[in-house]
Amino acid sequence: MRDASTRADEPPLARATDASLDALHRGLGWVGRHALGCSIAGAGVLALIAWYAAWHVPSSGWLFLSHYAVGFKDLVYRVQNVRNVQVGRTLYYAQLGTLQYFVYPPAALWLFWPLTWVGRFTGELLWTYASLICLAWLIASAGRAACAWRWPKAWAVALLVGAPLSALVLQPVGVHLALGQVGLFLAAPAVFDLLCVRDRRLRGVLVGVTAAFKLYPIVYVAFFALRREWRAVWNALGSMAAVTALAWAVFPGYSETFFFHRLLNGGELRHYWRNDHWISSSSSLYTVFFRQPFTGSPPERAVGLVLCAAAVLLGVLAARRLLAERREVGALLCLALGATVGSPVAWDHYFIWVVLVPFVLVERRPLAWWRTAALWLFVLACLVPLRLARNESLSHRAYDGTFLVILTARNALAVTSLVWLVAACVPARAPDPDGDRDQPRAATVASHQARSAG
């Protein structure tokens, strides 16, 4: 712990954050001492949230009165995709006229296949509950890495505190649940692999498996590369290839269409250019150049793609900086947000990574004040129902106060993500080596122990 004089030298925001974190630490200590009971209670709370979502989305307000035209819209279409495959119908259409088409590799069909064995309500209830359990798994993995918690305490905190609060308060998580999205099923095992798996024979395998279901997680191989864990890189690529090959053997026609036509013909991106929902709601830097005052002209599109590549590179550089400071959770957040805003399509539910912020704040404290401020800005953007102010019909064309509100709502997630990435790149003051030698961080000690055990 730092002494009073050290705390007095800190900016007010940092002192307030430290005081809040200390109080939270005391509360979580009680949860850790009653881990089993808290885990059971937390699982029950998540079951109630899943039941509420299954019954009330979209007929009543879900998070700040954010109504949805159809509950679990994306999940309903994915289950229908599986039913089409079961009777030999088309999975990948040549003309992409709507957003509701299958965007994943054929291996992802297995994620949705069990939902065809039950009724719609049961499927939505089970899917939502499983999503919340995956959210708890993600949070528990981050807690173990950042706070050196034992698994019982990590799961207790995640089930009783982290996952319920995230679902009820954070907009990206709420949107994810209301649409029946798949992201948490992929993020949880990937985070566990990146932060907790230390056995060199297994490290990287789960990242590769998730990348076979959706190509996006392959970006996390950069995490292993930055740490020069080359065996983990090959494990990830090998497991991705193995799952893809298995899916190719089961779905040869669909696999050929996806990898040789859908990914190569450019239609996956071009069809968005005239889609009002994407233009108004995507938080990608590429999408910015299709909004007022831009028109999506060829030069503007080229600039957008360059900026997307720059955002991904910025995320990698920020992750490298934080890994050099031994802040693994912070580095993962940088990679995730860089890849998100650097993707040509970035929906609100892509920003579920906000659940990592508390652990970035406590990992190897103290965090530099400018980084703390950037993280709080990102959290603030994730608390506001931005989708309600984006003018999805694109009907407002005037340059007035309303335009500024719309502009802010459309770009808040991207801007605050970039602010964090820039803040993470700015070097922080090196810790006092004598202080570190006398009082080693618990997280560092646990990390060394875990590596030795692995």
Predicted regions and their residues:
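Primarily membrane-embedded glycan-assembly and transfer machineries that use lipid-linked glycans
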Residues: 2, 9-203, 227-348, 401, ...
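Aromatic-enriched
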Residues: 52-58, 361-450, 454
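Juxtamembrane/interfacial segments around transmembrane helices
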Residues: 90-101, 211-217, 265-268, 285-296, ...
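Short alpha-helical "patches" and their helix-cap loops
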Residues: 124-130, 208-209, 237-240, 261, ...
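Membrane-embedded alpha-helical segments of multi-pass membrane proteins
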Residues: 129-134, 181-189, 210-216, 237, ...
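Transmembrane alpha-helices and membrane-interface helical segments
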Residues: 137, 141, 188-199, 224-228, ...
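Transmembrane helices and adjacent periplasmic/lumenal helix-loop junctions
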Residues: 207-224, 342-353
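Short amphipathic alpha-helical segments
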Residues: 333, 337, 348, 352, ...
